[in-house]
Amino acid sequence: MTLQECYRQIGGDYNAAIDRFKNESTLERFVLMFPSDQSMSLLHTGIEIGNISLSFRSVHSLKGVAANLSFTDLQQKASALTEQLRYRSEQPDAELLDAVERSYKATVGAISEYKASKA
């Protein structure tokens, strides 16, 4: 699997990412670090303990990382959840959260598949 194929699989914008990072080796380094980002874990923690502020900050960070890496599908889904939580008045909408979780899992799965294909 190529990095471009990985991006296609997750609904990302490979060309925008290359424009931002200037070359594939730099982009690859950051893509491979993405699964270790703690934003999704912190989002779940915030939900579990009922801390809407933590949930908001976590999904906002996830949205930003996804945007910087041009993971378009994940960024859009995280953005919708971010806006729902922005005013910190309610727990995350279950459908929005599910969409973020599915996109996140697909993204991490594709990155793992890409990494395995390089070994």
Where are these regions (language model features)?
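Alpha-helix N-cap/helix-start motif at coil-to-helix transitions, marked by capping-box chemistry
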Residues: 8, 32-34, 72-75
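Conserved catalytic segment of histidine kinase HATPase_c domains, centered on the N-box/ATP-lid region
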Residues: 87-91
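Long, amphipathic alpha-helical coiled-coil segments characteristic
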Residues: 11-61, 92-115
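Short, well-ordered alpha-helical segments
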Residues: 39, 51, 55-58, 66-86, ...
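Intrinsically disordered or compositionally simple regulatory linkers and C-terminal tails
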Residues: 1-5
